[in-house]
């Protein structure tokens, strides 16, 4: 249960397996964001338990979640616009030559080399790692954010609407990167309203309604209309899937 601005939202008896790509879908207010905030350490449940990799966890902050191997790609990307690509990938994880009291000297060459390796592993090509991310396109910025998450979040990556603000070609590139993560056996949870994308990228869909997961279905066994019926609670004949794509 979570309290935010006098509003209560409960997530009850819900579980998601690992080693798969899973999408979370549901109408606004269904509990998707609350669920994500809880597993990424942004908010703490007032009661109940969260288990990760078979162990109970109590994340007090996003840092706790990251230290457990959970990385998040937010809609706003959480990038530092005035820093270059390498500095963003190593944000909070800088490699130091040595420290002298409050002063530290960064090993920028090692950071740049490692950044190139992480980008290559994710299938991303960026010619100049010294450019500020503010000068990059939305798709390139998203690629940097995903590469950073994939580099440090080997146990789970959570993506919030990963292509919401991108054009057709940039969306295609980001989707290719997400598929690359599957080939690397990196589990991913995607929050999305785009059912076409969901069916293309994930193995299972967790449908949220009224603060709980009401069903988890395999994309190979259902249609878009089936999922819309679960989202709305209506017979699938009463609403067209196009309204959710």
Model-found features: residue ranges?
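Single conserved hydrophobic/aromatic residue that forms the stacking wall/gate
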Residues: 1-7, 11
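Conserved ABC transporter NBD signature motif
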Residues: 48-59, 64-68
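H-loop/switch region of ABC-family ATPase nucleotide-binding domains
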Residues: 192-193
């Amino acid at each position: 249960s979570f309290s935010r601005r006098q509003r209560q939202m409960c997530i009850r008896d819900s579980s998601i397996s690992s080693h798969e790509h899973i999408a979370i879908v549901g109408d606004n207010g269904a509990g998707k964001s609350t669920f994500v905030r809880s597993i990424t350490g942004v908010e703490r449940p007032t009661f109940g338990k969260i288990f990760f990799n078979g162990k109970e966890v109590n994340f007090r902050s996003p840092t706790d979640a990251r230290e457990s191997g959970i990385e998040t790609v937010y809609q706003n990307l959480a990038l530092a616009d005035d820093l270059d690509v390498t500095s963003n990938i190593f944000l909070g994880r800088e490699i130091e030559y040595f420290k002298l009291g409050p002063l530290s000297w960064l090993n920028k060459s090692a950071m740049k080399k490692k950044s190139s390796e992480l980008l290559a592993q994710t299938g991303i090509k960026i010619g100049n790692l010294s450019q500020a991310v503010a000068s990059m396109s939305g798709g390139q910025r998203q690629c940097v954010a995903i590469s950073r998450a994939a580099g440090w979040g080997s146990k789970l990556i959570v993506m919030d609407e990963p292509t919401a603000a991108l054009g057709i070609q940039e969306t295609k590139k980001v989707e290719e990167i997400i598929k690359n993560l599957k080939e690397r056996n990196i589990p991913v949870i995607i929050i999305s309203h785009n059912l076409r994308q969901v069916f293309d990228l994930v193995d299972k869909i967790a449908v949220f309604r009224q603060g709980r997961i009401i069903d988890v279905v395999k994309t190979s066994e259902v249609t878009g209309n089936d999922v819309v019926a679960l989202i709305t609670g209506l017979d699938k004949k009463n609403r067209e899937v196009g309204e959710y794509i």
